[in-house]
Amino acid sequence: MANFIDRRLNAKGKSTVNRQRFINRYKQQIKKAVSDAVTRRSVTDVDKGEKISIPTRDISEPMFHQGKGGVRDRVHPGNDQFTRGDKIDRPQGGSGGGAGKGDASDSGEGNDDFVFEISKDEYLELLFEDLELPNLQKNRLNKLVEYQIYRAGFTNDGVPANINIVRSLRSSLARRIAMSASKKKLLKESEQELAELENIPGTKAELILDLKAQIEELKRKIAKVPFIDTFDLRFNNFSRREVPSSQAVMFCLMDVSGSMDQATKDMAKRFYILLYLFLTRTYKNLEVVYIRHHTQAKEVDEHEFFYSQETGGTIVSSALKLMHEIQQARYPADEWNIYAAQASDGDNWADDSPTCKQLLEQKILPLVRYFSYIEITNRAHQTLWREYESLQQHYDNIAVQHIRQAEDIYPVFRELFKKQAV
């Protein structure tokens, strides 16, 4: 009985190439489904795969089929009513989308959609396609390189600690074979000749003695071939490779004053998670600093940032001051790519908004790569929005956007991080 072993790279019954063709062909429909899925998902599920549903009419293929006109000769099975030459009425069926009788058709409306699943990587690839980190400039960070030691074959010289015994013995064997092969062949022939001469009566003793001397000389030369020589030694070679140090820090600043209800906080959290996933696809090392503020700001962990019930009044500048202090103490601007995302409902103590502008203008914007401010509210903008908006006229690394409902989160995110025209 024959046994077949499937050694294909793709899973049984699947084709990665065809899958990628399908995704590329219907990318617009899939991207729309991905965009819709972002608003439906819970915060904890935002980075998982997704079931994509595409209307059947969007994936229909051109096909040849019988037209509605013309004269046709057919033989219908089970005919007991008509004979050749009879004329019958054309069946009044639907256009292929219903259950009526009639000819098949590729038109008509149906309710069944084509549903398939995309993986987490495919989902994130579509989610962040055509996006980039704004104002990503080369500074000292790109000159700070780490050296990674890696194996680089073998070399003929090195320190004893790096000697490769197997390679050295293999080289020794090859050298000994090369240097003694001809002598061993000649020795074997000489020994055979000596045995034949000794079996022949009347052979001259001088001839036998000369042959024995030749054999001894060959054995001496073969024995003089050293077992191992410095020429045979092989050492493991190690080389250094430059590895650019790619590290970034993201400051998440969230207003938790009494005016920020749980729904508003949840929308802010969705935005932060999208930003985190986006940055992790660019940087290997990403640190996140969570700062909550009402009248006072405090650095917290992730759980407390999103779920703490602490609340109070609103002084936004306290968060900006704390962010600057943490950045100065732990994240030098010449070694880190610094990003910040601030979410608020825009409700701030009126006298504090100019202070926020001053902090951004003098201490924060000169150091950060990008500062994004999203205001989540259905009310009219207040002083904080106007102060932040005025900074956009002088700085290209700050952006302010308005979110009214959950459906606005993903479009706003794409607007903040869309690729800039060259």
From Swiss-Prot:
Coiled coil: none annotated. InterPro entries: UPF0229. Residues 70-90 have a biased composition (Basic and acidic residues). Residues 60-111 are annotated as: Disordered. It comes from the Bacteria. NCBIfam families: PRK05325.1-2 (NF003707), PRK05325.1-3 (NF003708). Belongs to the UPF0229 family. This is UPF0229 protein SO_2883. It comes from Shewanella oneidensis (strain ATCC 700550 / JCM 31522 / CIP 106686 / LMG 19005 / NCIMB 14063 / MR-1). The lineage of its organism: Bacteria, Pseudomonadati, Pseudomonadota, Gammaproteobacteria, Alteromonadales.
